[in-house]
């Protein structure tokens, strides 16, 4: 479904089950993850972050009407949270419903470990298992949180660049 958006993504070879869990088998992408490149060359973090943000914005510029809606996916996840009582789940669902209805492609797990830097420097995004259509700000918020868990400086750099460029 995401292929319909016209993004340059690895070819899906197979959908299969491994240890009774669903798995996507994609064509092999030669290179290193952007995360590895950033760790090896921290002096150029700003340059790599700019390329990373530009890549995410290219994704957000696309639409794919056949993708699952982000709000539907989040509503399902909220409803499955048994750690919360019904009132708490209801309050979250009301807040979710107030989110703007957008149809932008959202990767759902966009972080430097899911970007392969090819030998020619070309960036390729992998791990499209969580892709949806919805509010790009929610996708960016998830990316920010993933950065913040590992590196607060990188998280702030990401957020600043994303806000300036979007």
Regions found by a protein language model. Give the residues of each.
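Activation of the activation-loop gatekeeper triad in protein kinase-fold domains
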Residues: 127-131
């Amino acid at each position: 479904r995401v292929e319909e958006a016209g993004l340059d993504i690895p070819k899906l070879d197979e959908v299969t089950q491994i240890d009774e869990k669903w798995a996507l088998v994609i064509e092999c992408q030669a290179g290193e993850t952007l995360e590895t490149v950033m760790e090896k060359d921290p002096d150029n973090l700003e340059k790599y972050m700019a390329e990373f943000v530009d890549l995410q914005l290219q994704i957000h510029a696309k639409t794919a009407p056949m993708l699952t809606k982000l709000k539907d996916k989040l509503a399902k996840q909220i409803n499955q949270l048994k750690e919360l009582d019904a009132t708490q789940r209801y309050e979250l669902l009301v807040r979710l419903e107030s989110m703007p209805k957008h149809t932008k492609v959202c990767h759902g797990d966009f972080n430097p470990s899911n970007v392969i830097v090819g030998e020619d420097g070309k960036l390729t995004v992998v791990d499209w298992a969580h892709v949806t259509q919805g509010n790009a700000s929610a996708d960016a918020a998830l990316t920010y949180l993933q950065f913040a868990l590992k590196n607060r400086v990188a998280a702030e750099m990401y957020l600043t660049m994303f806000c300036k460029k979007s």
